[in-house]
Amino acid sequence: MSADYWNSSQRNQWQLTRFSLLEARRRVLLLERKMIQNGLIKDYPNIIYDYNMRIYLHNLLIKLGRRLNIRQIALATAEIYLTRFLTRVSLKEINVYLLITTCIYVACKIEECPQHIRLILSEARNIWPEYIPHDVTKLAEFEFYLIEEMDSYLLLHHPYKSLMQINEFLSNNYNVFGFKLTVEELQNAWSLINDSYITDLHLLLPPHTIAVAAIYITVVLKKNLSRVRQGNNNDNNININTMHISTGSSTNPININNNNNTNTSNNNGTTSTTTTTTAQETQVLGQDDNTEMNIDDLMNLTKSSNNSQDKSDDKMDIDNPLQSQVNLSQIQNQTQHQHQESTHNNTSSTNTGRNGINGQISQSNQELNNFDLDILDEDTIKINKFMNFLEHSHINLDEVVEAVQDMMNMYVLWNRYNEQGVKKALQVMLLNRI
């Protein structure tokens, strides 16, 4: 394992493509069918590794991590272990509660914050007494099973470090790029990275790409959010659910309060937060950010700001997450075009001034009346500077777009998350084994 990502086993052994990941999961399904046909396991059609299951497992992992006061880095490592393991093993042949406990146990060892095996097992039994055995040897056996399926490649690089490095670079080169992250933006980006572990991004893309995508959502789409909210101030006839994108407390990242649905589920333990952290992490996550984003706002964030003129386009069909598209290149070209227009207007004003003082005053007044005030907006200026940084960074913008799309789609699906359905399906499967 190398000290840098580019020579690491994470990149050389476990960085997959969309196709290879799909093939791996297809092989798991084929193996699952053979085991069912041979009578080795029973068939439970409701057990599906979809986003409902992923969010549920994410919440379980965070819940146990809180009980043990485990650092966020260790929890992130455990979640990647979980994702890797489930690319090779079917959910129907394992105890997912014991798997989560084992992932945390191994991750704490790797991240140098070890927890005693009896302590972890005891806390897990307090939370899930029906599913966690008393025998510590079961956890020890599962540990070897987990390590074997991951081919003993356990060390990981996370986007958190990349986020801090980017923030430090921007702060040190503020005179060059004129852009740096505020404490609030840094905290929001950190929280977005927390939630990104629900997706497959950490098996597909480098950590720095995910960090840039989190910054992109925090900084660039913040401008579109303000426009959407201004454009939708009069559209209060539809009751939309509330979504928390960033939070530094125990607030649920998605708080569903739909008055039109009588079967409202109480989602316990949903989080996008951290527990006990290092001194550097505490500086980022120490504040409680209660910024709320409306799900309708979130959907409109994925559109170009040019579409804000069309009221019918302000309401996307949230039932189709594939409509959630973010074109980074388009926004980049838009900001460059704004720069060119600004330069052209300033040049025109200067040339007019050379022809006479009266003409200069008249032209300046006319331009002031017709000038696009958005170019003077603080958020727009910050976006332009961020795009300038991306242009000089040589970061793969296609990968950034891919990461942003996956993260936005994840929040769309999270809004339809059904915890009780997943919990009940797992209960039926696991209790029938006893």
UniProtKB/Swiss-Prot annotation:
Coiled coil start-end: none
Keyword Transcription regulation listed: yes
An annotated GO cellular component: CKM complex
Alphabetically ordered keywords of this record: Activator, Cyclin, Nucleus, Repressor, Transcription, Transcription regulation
Pfam family membership, one: Cyclin_N
Domain Cyclin N-terminal: 23-155
GO molecular function: cyclin-dependent protein serine/threonine kinase regulator activity; RNA polymerase II core promoter sequence-specific DNA binding
Residue stretches of biased makeup (Low complexity): 248-278, 330-359
Principal localisation: nucleus
Domain of life: Eukaryota
Annotated compartments: Nucleus
Region spans: Disordered: 248-292, 301-320, 330-362
Gene Ontology biological process: cellular response to heat; fungal-type cell wall organization; meiotic cell cycle; negative regulation of transcription by RNA polymerase II; positive regulation of transcription by galactose; positive regulation of transcription by RNA polymerase II
Record-linked Gene3D superfamilies: Cyclin-like
Similarity-based family: Belongs to the cyclin family. Cyclin C subfamily.
Purpose of the protein: Component of the SRB8-11 complex. The SRB8-11 complex is a regulatory module of the Mediator complex which is itself involved in regulation of basal and activated RNA polymerase II-dependent transcription. The SRB8-11 complex may be involved in the transcriptional repression of a subset of genes regulated by Mediator. It may inhibit the association of the Mediator complex with RNA polymerase II to form the holoenzyme complex. The SRB8-11 complex phosphorylates the C-terminal domain (CTD) of the largest subunit of RNA polymerase II.
Self-association state and partner proteins as the record states: Component of the SRB8-11 complex, a regulatory module of the Mediator complex.
Protein name: RNA polymerase II holoenzyme cyclin-like subunit
Species name: Candida albicans (strain SC5314 / ATCC MYA-2876) (Yeast)
